[in-house]
Amino acid sequence: MLLEYSRNKFNNSPFENIRLLEILKGGEVLLKRKEFINLCRNYSPRPNNKEHSSLAHKILAEVTSYHDSQTEKLPVIWLETNCSCDNNISIMNTTYPYLDRFLEETIDLLYSNTFMAAQGQDAVNNLKAAANQKADQFTLVVEGAIPLKEEYNVVFITSQGEVSALEAVKWLGGLAKYVVALGTCASFGGPSAARPNLSQSAAVSEVLDCEVINVSGCPVNADWFVGTIAHLLMYGRPELDDRNRPTLFYGYTIHRNCQRRSYFDNGNLAENLGEIECMFSQGCVGPKTRADCPYRQWINVNWPVEANTPCIGCTNPDFPDGSTPFFTPLPEKKNS
C-alpha cells in the first residue's frame, strides 16, 4: 500500500490541479504561504522534465515574481568554519536551475569563502563593509562547527591579526537578522564534534545567544537550503521543530515515508546489504531520523535506501556517534 502510494507520488505532481498564484492588492503576484509550505513538503521532482525537475526550479519563478515588486534581494553572508565544504558542493549540484540563477535572482551574496571572486584583504574589507551596511538585514549562513579549543580555526586574517571561527561567528551573529546553521556540523556539531572531539567543536547555537535555524544534513539536500532561504525572503522565520529545524523538511521520520515500510510492518527484513527488504536489520536509523529523503531524493535521482543501503541518520543531533557502528541494528548501536 505504502509502496504504491510512493510510486504515485513520483509519477504525479500534486500541484497540477491547484492554483499556485494569487493576485493580491497592488498588483503583486505572490505564492501564498500555505501553498509554499505544501510545495516544500510534497513536491515530487520529475528528473526527465525540466518543468518539474526540482523544488528549487519551482520556487525560483515565485521568488523572481516577488523580487519584481521589491527593491532588494535577501542579503546573505556565508561563512565556512570547521567543515568539509560538502554542503556548498551539494548545493552546487542542484540540477535545474543551476546555482548561478539562485545566486543572481534569489539572494545577494555579500561574502562567501567559496563563491566570491575577491580574496585576501579585499575579501575581508568586503565582509566588514557588508556587515556594517546591512546590519539587522542580512542572513548569516554558517557552514561548519565552531572549534573552541584555543579558539581554532582561523577563517580569515586582518591587518590586526588572525580571526577565529568563534570570533567571526560571534561578531556576525550579533549583527544578523537571521542565523542559519547549514549542515549537521553547524547545526549540532556533527562529524567535527565526533568522539573524541579533540578540537572541542560545538554547534553554532552553543556559541550564540540568538535563535539559530538549523538546516541539518551531511550534506544537506539543496532543496532544504533553497526552501529555507526562500521562506525567510518571502515570509520570514519558518515553523521550527524542537531542534530548530524547519518542519517543512524535517517534519516526519524517514521510516514513516520509506518505500520499504510495508516490508518492516510485515516483518520482512533484509539479511544482507543490497537486498530489497527493509534495512532495519542492516543498521538503518530511519525510525529516529527526521527528513523527507524518500520522496525528495538526491539530485532528483535516488536516495540511500532505494539504492539498497541503510539510512545513517545524517540529519540527527547525535550523528555520527549515535549511528555507529553503521551496519549494526538500531537497538544495538552504542549511543542510540
What are these regions (language model features)?
Residues 2-3:
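Intrinsically disordered, low-complexity segments enriched in serine/proline and basic residues
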Residues 12-29:
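Short, Lys/Arg-enriched N-terminal segments with co-localized hydrophobic residues
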Residues 21-24, 32, 36-283, 287-288, ...:
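Iron-sulfur-associated redox domains of electron-transfer enzymes in respiratory
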Residues 276-336:
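C-terminal, charge/polar-rich interaction regions
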